[in-house]
Design a protein with these regions (language model features):
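Compact, glycine-rich, soluble single-domain proteins
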Residues: 43-66, 81
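Intrinsic-disorder/low-complexity, polar/charged segments enriched in Ser/Thr/Lys/Arg/Asp/Glu/Gln
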Residues: 14, 25-29, 98-100, 112-114, ...
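Segments adjacent to and within acyl-thioester-processing domains across lipid
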Residues: 1-4, 127-137
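Beta-strand elements of well-folded, non-transmembrane domains
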Residues: 34-36, 107, 121, 133-135
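Hydrophobic beta-strand-centered segment that forms part of the acyl-chain substrate-binding groove
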Residues: 64-102, 126-130
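Catalytic strand-loop segment that frames the active site of acyl-thioester-processing enzymes
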Residues: 11-51
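Hydrophobic beta-sheet segments that form the core/acyl-binding groove
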Residues: 19, 86-122
């Protein structure tokens, strides 16, 4: 399954490189290979390049959207990022690192869903957050 088959974002806002696993309406796992050519690194100095934290949250949001839009009844709907609770950033991400984002949906009622997401890099946790999604009816 291709990322572009499920989420409407395109370059430069499509941040997921590959969908690793998906259980429709339950969970999704995706990968992102962080390269030096990413748009968010262009204004940073060569020695201090780290991925900005809102981009990490957007990776989690896009992974959660994959879990939602893989459900036949929601395929093709618009999903909006409704909010963040309890985001906990553990470490920085630098160019050359491979991220694995995992989001598990915890509640889904009508057009509102919540989930818990975690991004890891080489086995260490980078960020975890509770997310809210709102689907357009």
């Amino acid at each position: 399954m291709e990322v572009t088959d499920l989420i409407p974002q395109r370059f430069p806002l499509q941040l997921l490189d590959r969908i690793v696993a998906v259980q429709p309406g339950v969970s999704a796992t995706a990968e992102k290979l962080v390269t030096i050519n990413e748009w968010f690194f262009q204004s940073q100095t060569l020695t201090g390049r780290t991925m900005i934290r809102p981009v990490l949250l957007e990776i989690l949001a896009q992974t959660g959207v994959v879990a939602l839009l893989s459900m036949p009844e929601h395929h093709g709907n618009n999903v909006f990022f409704g909010g963040i609770r309890q985001a906990d950033f553990k470490t920085d991400v630098r160019p050359g690192e491979r991220l694995e984002a995992m989001v598990t949906l915890t509640k889904l009622r009508r057009q509102i869903g919540t989930g818990h997401g975690v991004i890891t890099c080489a086995g260490r946790e980078v960020v975890s957050a509770d997310l809210t999604f709102v689907m357009q009816a």
